[in-house]
Amino acid sequence: MADGAGIDRKADEKIQFSTSKEVTVHPTFESMSLKESLLRGIYAYGYESPSAVQSRAIVQICKGRDTIAQAQSGTGKTATFSISMLQVIDTAVRETQALVLSPTRELATQIQSVVMALGDYMNVQCHACIGGTNVGEDIRKLDYGQHIVSGTPGRVADMIRRRHLRTRHIKMLVLDEADELLNQGFREQIYDVYRYLPPATQVVVVSATLPYDVLDMTTKFMTDPVRILVKRDELTLEGLKQYFIAVEKEDWKFDTLCDLYDTLTITQAVIFCNTRRKVDWLTDKMREANFTVSSMHGDMPQKERDSIMQDFRQGNSRVLISTDVWARGIDVQQVSLVINYDLPSNRENYIHRIGRSGRFGRKGVAINFVTSEDVRILRDIECMWLPSPCFSCG
């Protein structure tokens, strides 16, 4: 049963933590010595009691400790670092004091929304600093002064270099969905940002998956971090059924999808493809067959992506076809089905994709289309995430 903030408490209690010895559990938000105005925002947001990761991580982060926090999708990771940032900033000082870096523009914008909601009684300023938007607006907002900035690495680094994002008051750097951020593409940009920050800046790393190479890399800019880690064999999603459908040829996937579309009763669904070109192709094919779908990928202008996301969040569109730009951390509570039209080549991305379904403890279904070429990837995914094979054959 999910509470008002959408956390599945039953699943939450089953999480196994491999944590640093000094970590204590705080069963209530009141026991964390949080500001009164922040507590009001937490309760107004719908939280009644902290989730497993919140009860362990918030106090450690508020103490100023470098922290690595790992927990599965839908367990309140975003609120964990948002509450912590709101606790440590001084709203009387209109300077940037906390910085969050995310791998996608949509996730950075969502984090801004969570911060503003939780900080509703604190008069907090928080800006989403993301690529694809008006640079002049960024400059205006940053020059005015923002307590918290949530952004993508490229635009944030640019604003720092232009001296519009002032870093001298920054106390905390949060790397959200750190596995993706620290992959090859973002690594150098993160270092670009980090070298401008004060030497004493606290670093918080948050993700559903933390492969060894990511943990290894964090040693370069973290000092004696507190670790709150979920065991790898616990990284499955409660209440989510996973299936594969064997399709002999790539060409057969489309007909299979049309059959599924006709027979399944769903609230909302996300269909993942591996390339932007495939997203466009599949969208056109579905529309030609008189199916109503929307689509989104990284080549689209940011305004168009924002509009598509808003329509999907509000339930105006039921089926979204997307690349992995949508796979990480985006919460739309009514998504009950994820279809991997293409299996992800990155096995970590599989957990992020299927985590879009059954958010916050609701029941969800993930369906994977598997050709003969995909069998190796499927086995790889099985070995990575599932203690014993439990895929059902369609």
Curated annotation (Swiss-Prot):
What this protein is called in its record is ATP-dependent RNA helicase FAL1
The entry assigns this protein to a family as follows: Belongs to the DEAD box helicase family. DDX48/FAL1 subfamily.
Keywords, alphabetical? ATP-binding, Helicase, Hydrolase, Nucleotide-binding, Nucleus, Ribosome biogenesis, RNA-binding, rRNA processing
EC number(s) on file: 3.6.4.13
Q: Pinpoint the Helicase ATP-binding domain residues.
A: 58-228
What domain notes does the record hold? Answer: The Q motif is unique to and characteristic of the DEAD box family of RNA helicases and controls ATP binding and hydrolysis.
Q: Per the record, GO CC terms? A: nucleolar chromatin
Where does the chain bind ATP?
Answer: A71, Q72, S73, G74, T75, G76, K77, T78
InterPro entries from the xrefs?
DEAD/DEAH_box_helicase_dom, Helicase_ATP-bd, Helicase_C-like, P-loop_NTPase, RNA-helicase_DEAD-box_CS, RNA_helicase_DEAD_Q_motif
What subcellular compartments does it reside in? Nucleus, Nucleolus
Q: Which residues form the Helicase C-terminal domain?
A: 239-394
Please tell me the species this chain comes from: Chaetomium globosum (strain ATCC 6205 / CBS 148.51 / DSM 1962 / NBRC 6347 / NRRL 1970)
